[in-house]
Structure formats: C-alpha cells, structure tokens
C-alpha cells in the first residue's frame, strides 16, 4: 500500500460465496455410419454439433444410419447431439474398429474417441452415449463403457435383439455402473423407405433420457416413460401387471431395460449393469456424476487462493447453497457440507490441500410400490346401523 493519500480510495474486496451452476445432463454423444458424397457435407470422423433433424440430414444425408439415429432422438426430445459419422464398411471387423476409433498420427481422434473433443470443440460434454446396433458387439460395448467412465456419462448399449436368453448372456459381459443395456430393438415407419423397419433401441432410449431430464430432471428415471414414433418392438416382450414371472420382469431381473406395450410402448427398467449394488439405479449414477462435475467446474475460482478462514467459509457457504438448491428442486433428499477437521491438518494445509466433505441422499425411483389389501368383516355390522 502507498503512504499518504488525500482523496477517496475504492478497493475491490473479492470475497464471498460463489454460485455453482449445473452442467447439462442430456447432451448425447452419437457414433454411427454414413457415406460421404454429394448429399452429405460432413467428412468421415468429423465431429459435428447437431441441434435438429435438418442439420443431421445436411451433414450426413437423408439415408444414413447416423441420420436415422438422430431422427429417433428428435422424435422425443429437443437435444444437443455431438455426432461423429464414420465410413460405412462392408467388412464387419473393420467396421467395428472404425466405430471404436483411435488417435491418428496428426492427433485427430476418430470414432468413439472423437467424442472426447466435444467439450473443447463445442463446450458440449456428452452425458448419454450411443453407437446404435454396433454396441451389440462386445468390443464396441466395452469401448463405450470405457468412454463413459472418462466423460462421466451413461453408455446406452443395445442387446442382441434376438432372444431373452441371448440378451441375458450378453449382459453378463458387463459389470459397470455406467452400462445401461436395452433389449429388444424397436420397429417404426421409415418415410424414406415407405415401410416399417427394425432399428436398434439405444438412440430412442437416449432421446427418452433427454426428454425425461427436461420434463422431470436429471435425477428422474426414464423407465415407465412412453416412446413416441415407434410402432412395435423387435420381438414381443410379455408384460403382465403383478406377474413376477413375465418376460419383462425376467429381463429386468438381469438388469436389462426392456420395452413393453402397456398404454403405448414404454421403457421398462431402472438398473445399470453394475456388479456393485450401491450403483444399481441409473438415477443414482447420474445424480452423483452431475453433482461431482458441478462442484468441479464451479471451483476453478478457488484454485490458488490464499487459505484463510474467509476462504474456507466462502467455499463452504457456496457448496451449502448449491446443495440446498438441489434439495429444493427435489434432486436430493438432504445433505451436509463441512470442511473436514481430521484431514485438514497443519501438514496438509501447508501443502496447499484443503478438504471438504459433501454428503447427500439421492432420490431413488419407486421401482416396487407395495399395496397390502385385506378383506375384513370389521365394518359388516354397519349395515344394521344404517337400517336403524
């Protein structure tokens, strides 16, 4: 500070809690095939930001598989799609490799790997990942889950779309909390082909996730929500209310989401393929991911600040306000936030490390409401009272 000064001095006091913003929960990362040509402006392995069906058609052409996947998404939801179209190949093994992708000598990422550039290119980090039909191949499904771990996303994986037994066998290849398997596929009317066609379910489910996020919140389950635009499923899935031996329940018991016909076609299933029961519900995984990323992105301002009592107080109050907002929205039930007195030792503080604990209870889906109905003669004599 300077010495004597005759006049008014104004100083910015840069303290106080900061607000924490929620990241978008429903940006979709999509990889599928197309053919380069006059009807497509995109080049193979270009990363494209898509916000409408019209943009998808312009980029990939009207008949491309990736365009059909975009249509499936937009049939239900207004969504931002980070899309990477790969060349359509005749060799199945080469096609699988193209979908999985890699990093080229010049540093360009291809296939699924290109989705990692969504945030740096478009400030759009995918939270829902799909490689329609291709994810029914284990190599692609595994790569999709690995990518989901990096992005804190959900990998929506297609089942084999053949039999229940095949779907259950395929599910046993995974044990990840970010893997969400759906089987069978869907059927819909394709205006380009003027016919009913079969399609993998993952793009349709991604659209349903995005719609649920918009209508109910990222903490809500897409299960028991109706699809728009489909006319059937790849195979009929038996569903009977109250019957725990029906085929839909058999698939759900194997942690496979399925599609039932019950007042429309509905997604039916809340569970991931996690081998850890703590992460069984997809809603818990997504809530944790969003909370963690919001805290991560919301505290860049706190890095390299001087560790003072005011600093600890400001961070704590900001976290409390953020969690309080989530509670008021219904995203969580309750929470606690505090600077950890045991971890914040003089040695740790001297190294520039400060620890906060954020604990919360998420909102589970009512997967199994139970109603106990009893018939009794308790009020039978009331007929006599009424007659008196």
Go through each PLM region and give its residues:
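Surface-exposed assembly/interface segments
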Residues: 1-388
């Amino acid at each position: 500070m300077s010495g004597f000064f005759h006049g008014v001095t104004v100083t910015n006091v840069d303290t106080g809690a900061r607000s924490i913003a929620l990241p978008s929960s429903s940006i979709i990362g999509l990889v599928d095939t197309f053919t380069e040509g006059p009807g497509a402006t995109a080049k193979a392995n270009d990363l494209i930001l898509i916000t409408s069906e019209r943009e998808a058609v312009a980029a990939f052409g009207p008949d491309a598989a990736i365009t059909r996947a975009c249509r499936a998404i937009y049939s239900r939801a207004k969504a931002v799609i980070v899309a990477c179209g790969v060349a359509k190949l005749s060799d199945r093994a080469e096609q699988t490799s193209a979908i999985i992708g890699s990093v080229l000598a010049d540093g360009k990422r291809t296939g699924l790997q290109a989705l990692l550039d969504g945030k740096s290119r478009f400030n759009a980090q995918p939270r829902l990942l799909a490689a329609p039909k291709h994810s029914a191949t284990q190599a692609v499904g595994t790569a999709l889950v690995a990518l989901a771990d990096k992005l804190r996303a959900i990998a929506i994986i297609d089942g084999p779309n053949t039999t229940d037994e095949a779907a259950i066998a395929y599910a046993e290849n995974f044990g990840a909390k970010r893997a969400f398997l759906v089987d069978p596929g869907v059927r819909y009317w394709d205006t380009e082909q003027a016919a009913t066609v079969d399609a993998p379910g993952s793009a349709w489910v991604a659209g349903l996730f995005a719609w649920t996020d918009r209508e109910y919140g990222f903490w809500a389950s897409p299960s028991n929500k109706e699809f728009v635009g489909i006319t059937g499923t790849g195979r009929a899935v038996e569903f009977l209310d109250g019957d725990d031996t029906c085929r839909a329940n058999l698939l759900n018991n194997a942690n496979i989401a399925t599609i039932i016909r019950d007042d429309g076609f509905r997604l039916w299933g809340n569970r991931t393929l996690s081998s850890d029961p703590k992460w069984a519900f997809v809603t818990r995984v997504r809530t944790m991911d969003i909370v963690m990323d919001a805290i991560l992105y919301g505290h860049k301002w706190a890095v390299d600040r001087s560790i003072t009592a005011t600093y600890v107080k400001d961070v704590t109050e900001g976290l409390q306000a953020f969690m309080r907002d989530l509670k008021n929205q219904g995203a969580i039930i309750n929470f606690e936030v505090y600077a950890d007195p045991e971890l914040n030792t003089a040695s740790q503080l001297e190294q520039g490390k400060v620890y906060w604990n954020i604990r919360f209870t998420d909102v589970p889906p009512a997967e199994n409401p139970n109603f106990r109905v009893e018939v009794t003669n308790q009020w039978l004599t009331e007929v006599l009272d009424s007659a008196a």
